[in-house]
Amino acid sequence: MAFATINSAPPTHTAAQISTQIPTIEDAFGAEPALKKRIYDAIGSTPQYISLFEDIARYTSSLRTRNANSVQPIQVVHDEPAAKKRKLENGIGQGTGGAQSLADLKTHKALQFYMQDVSFAMPQRKKLTLEITAGNKYLRARNQTSKEVEFGVPLDRVQQVLCLPVPEKTQRQFNFCIIPQYADGINSPPNGVPVPEAVMWTINDGPAKAAFSGHGQQIGNQDGETAEDLVRQVLNENLSHTQVIRPCAQEFASAMPEGHRKGEMAYHVKAFRGSKEGYLFFLSTGIFFGYKKPLLFFAFENIDSISYTSVLQRTFNLNIVARATGSDETQEFEFSMIDQADYSGIDTYIKTHGLQDASLAEARRAKRYNINGAKTEENGEAASQEAEESELQKAQRELEDQEDEEEEDYDPGSEGESEGSGSSSEENSDDDQDDDADGNLVAEELGSEAEDVPEDEL
C-alpha cells in the first residue's frame, strides 16, 4: 500500500539534525510555542516531511510580513489628536518612525521568554502575556484571546527599569516599571522622535505559575524560585545599557514599617502631587513617583536642587527643581503632606547625593556622561555642605526653639491668644492646643496656605 510505502521510507535527517532549531520554523512560529512544539514533534516522528514544514513556515512568515507592511500607511495618516494617536499606535509613537516600529513590534519573532496571565497596569489595565523577543529584542504584551500584540517597546530604548514593592497590600507584590527614553516626565523628545509609553505590570511573590523559555519549557516554578527574581534576571540579561533597580536600605528606608505586612521594611513615602496621591521611592539612580499616570522619574543628572517648604509638626513638602537634558529651563515639582517621621532619612539621602545644592548639578550631569572635569572647588563645596546643618534640620530646630519659648511664657488664662509673633504664631498655638485635634489638623495639613487663613476660621 502507498501508506506502508511512505512509512517504510528511510529517514533523510538524523536525530541530531532534528533536535536542533530550524530557523524558518523559529521565525514563523516563535510566538506560538505550543504550535512550534507540535511541529517539532511531528518532524521527529516523520523527519521526511521537514522540507514541507519549512515551506509552510516560509509562507506563514511572508503572509505576516505582508500584513505588517500593509498597515503602515494607516498608522501615519491618522488625523486624531496626538494623545489618541499614541494610544491607537499601541504606545509606539507617531510619524513614519512610529509606524515602522509598530510593524517591527508586531512582526512575529522567535521568543526568548514569555509569561502568561500577567496583570498590566500601564499603558493598559488588563491581563496579557509578557514577551521578550530574541535577536532584535522587544518587550511586548500580547492579547491572550486574539493573539495580537497590544503594545511594547524596543529594549535598546529603555532608560530605566525599576522593580518596586507594592505598598499597602496584604499579599507581597512587585511592580515592574519600564521607563523608555523621553517617558520620564522630565525630558521631552526631539521633534519627530516617537515616544513609547511607560509600561508597568505587577508580579506576585512566590514561584512563577506560567513562565516559559522560548522553547516552551516551563521555568521559575521550583522551590526557592520566585517570579520576581526570574523576571529581573531575564530583563538584566537583555538590557544593554542599564539594569533593573530595586530599593535598598543603604539608600533609603522609611522610618515606618510596612503597615499591611508586619515586620517588613517599607521603602516608600506617601506624598501628594496636587490632589494626586502616590508614593516616592528614593533609589540609587534617582527619585521615582508613582503609581498613577504620569509616572515621574528624576534621574540625578536632571535634578538641579531639592528644598523643603511648609515644614510643620507632622508634615512637610518636598520641592524638586528639575532640568531636562540639554535644556536651560527648569521645572519645579512639589510633593506635599510627607510625614515628618521620614524627614531624617530623606535629608540624609539628599545630602549623600549632593542634591540640595544647585551648584553641584553640573557635576552630576558630568558624572552621568563620565566627564572628568576639575573637581576641587565642587568637592570642597560638597564637603562644606555635608558639615553644615541641612535646611530641614534648621527649620525643625527653629520650630522646636519657638515651642520651648512658648511653653515658658504660657499663660493658662490667655487661651492661646497671640503670644508669638510673625508667621510662627499658628505653629506655636498648634503646640499649646494639642488637645484640640480637629483644629490642629486643619492648620497643620494646610501647610503654607494656612498662613493666609484667619485663626478663628480654622
Swiss-Prot record:
SUPFAM superfamilies: PH domain-like. Residues 371-458 are annotated as: Disordered. Histones H3 and H4 chaperone involved in the nucleosome formation and heterochromatin silencing. Required for the deposition of H3K56ac-carrying H3-H4 complex onto newly-replicated DNA. Plays a role in the transcriptional regulation of the cell-cycle dependent histone genes by creating a repressive structure at the core histone gene promoter. GO terms for molecular function: DNA binding; histone binding; nucleosome binding. The lineage of its organism: Eukaryota, Fungi, Dikarya, Ascomycota, Pezizomycotina. It comes from Emericella nidulans (strain FGSC A4 / ATCC 38163 / CBS 112.46 / NRRL 194 / M139) (Aspergillus nidulans). Residues 400-418, 427-438, 446-458 have a biased composition (Acidic residues). This is Histone chaperone rtt106. One of its GO terms (cellular component) is chromosome. It is found in: Nucleus; Chromosome. Interacts with histones H3 and H4. InterPro entries: PH-like_dom_sf, RTT106/SPT16-like_middle_dom, RTT106/SSRP1_HistChap/FACT.
